[in-house]
Amino acid sequence: MKYLFPAALCLGLVLGCVKGPAESADINQAGPALRTALEAWKSGKSQQELADQQPSIIMNEDDWRERKRLIDYRMEEEGTLHGRQVVWRVQIKLQDKSGKAEDHKAKYVIDTTPRIVIVRDRFGR
């Protein structure tokens, strides 16, 4: 009995320090963030310029890093919440260094908490 109070106190402290589940991404913020990132790419800005602006957007896109040019894109009207992240499908038209243009179906995974991060999902369907 004399150990019950200290044990309960320790348990309360431990449980009080544990964070709850992470917040889900804000779907109303995800779409405009993705559009801003795609417009930056299309206009010739670098990924670093996108990260340096306010609000900062981190976009991990290999084709952009490889200096493929985004000629055009078409986002689906709505993204979907998948787990705690937003998934948005986009038709993109890319031009490589030789000038050849190709259409691609892309799927972007967007997180808005604690910061805006956009990653192209090359493995998902």
Q: What are the functions of these language-model segments?
A:
Residues 1-4:
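Positively charged n-region of N-terminal signal peptides that target proteins for export
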Residues 13-16:
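C-terminal motif of bacterial Sec signal peptides marking the signal peptidase cleavage site
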Residues 18-20:
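Bacterial signal peptide processing site
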Residues 24-32:
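Soluble non-cytosolic domains of exported or imported proteins
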Residues 32-71:
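Post-signal-peptide N-terminal segment of Sec-exported extracytoplasmic proteins
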Residues 72-77:
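Short structured motifs
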Residues 81-125:
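Exposed beta-sheet edge and beta->alpha loop/turn motif
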